[in-house]
Amino acid sequence: MKCKNTIAMVLAGAMLLPSNAFAADLSQYKDFPNDWSAKSLEQAIDDGLLNGSNGMIDAKGLLTRAQMAAIVSRAFGAAKTASLDDYRDVLPSAWYYSDMGKAVKMGAFQGANGLLNPDAPITREEAFTVLARAFALEGGGSATLKDFVDGGTVSSWASESVAALVAGGYVNGANGMLNLKNNITRAEFAKVITGMAASYVGAEGVSGKTVEGNVIVRESGASLSGMTINGDLIIADSADKVSLDNVKVTGRIVIRGASTEASLKNSSAGKSVLVSNPNGAASLSVSGGSVGTVTAKSDLVVSGSVDNIVIAEKAALTVQSGASVGSVTVSAAGASVSGAGTVSAVQANANNVTVSTKNTKVTAASGVSGVKAGDKTVDSGKTGTVGTAPSSGGSSSGGSSSSRSDYSYVLMNIPYDEFYKAEL
């Protein structure tokens, strides 16, 4: 079988292949099917996601929660583990102990009432929810499920995730049914996850390729250059350093790594760049190209030049010295914008937003409180500038009848209050 899903890099005339570049010997599985699932199962085995046992692949067997945790952690190259002390049903001696810890650390798995239920079969809606979390999928809405006979049976906690997979074309159902309450088989899950991850990139990187579908970079040090990805590019949990040079991504660039340093040179994202990890701050450097809007759902350090950033969850945005950001929109309470770089404007649509980047114009939306421009409070519906007095009427220069320059104290490096006290 030709390996269609492995990307290689041509360097100095040598072909460097990832570890999963060679097709698995399927003859070792005496129960390997010859039906609709064969291609997906073969790909899942080649990609290092699915393993058999005792000469059996057990395609029709039900996937357990522990097995799914193992597959997802392999797909994303997860290495860090969360403490499982709060879960009384996962013993350190169990084969899946490490995988369950990785899946929890990723934010893909969540338990309830002190239980992770590792040995229980996983339902289709549970599996779709885990995948939506891992791939950082959003959108679709409940209306997306109305075309399915059983779309209304989806659990409230799974609705958005299931809709996202349907909207993305990853789940189609059968005979007008999604069968959300049914347990998912190993073959069914292989079909879904191989449709969501077409290719993987290791530390050896890739050059000069066009890839159809989503690509996951799951090892640190990867360099991608001169290529087109017709889908999403996901920089996974253990990919600490990744560089892109002249790479066109028609979908999203998703940064999942907790300490990822992503360098984008003359590269583009057709939809957006999403920074989403539960475990630390990622760094993003942009030089040339067009990445559209960068959405931060976790702490982010920016260098280079970025037009627009949206802080969608409570997070800290740090703009490095020499870096520039056109505008920042904050929709999460308690978020902050700081650093020695420049930010032209911040729109604060949530409470308790703090901005300390010099000369940044900060606008507090109507009904919002606790917004700070430097050490000054910006009242609801008004605008202030870091280093100057807050103003009324939405302008950083309006609202004052004094002929004194609001910028004099900045140039003299004297605190605002002390400057005007001295004048009086």
What are these regions (language model features)?
Residues 189-190:
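Short, structured beta-strand segments at or near domain termini in extracellular proteins/domains
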Residues 100-105, 109-116, 120-125, 129, ...:
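A generic tandem-repeat structural signature
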Residues 22-47, 56-58, 91, 387-424:
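Low-complexity, acidic Ser/Thr/Pro-rich repeat tracts that form intrinsically disordered stalk/linker regions
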Residues 2-38, 46-98, 105-126, 132-159, ...:
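Feature responds to low-complexity, polar/acidic, surface-exposed segments characteristic
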Residues 4, 19, 24, 46, ...:
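Intrinsic-disorder/low-complexity regions
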Residues 198-394:
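Extended beta-solenoid/beta-helix repeat architectures
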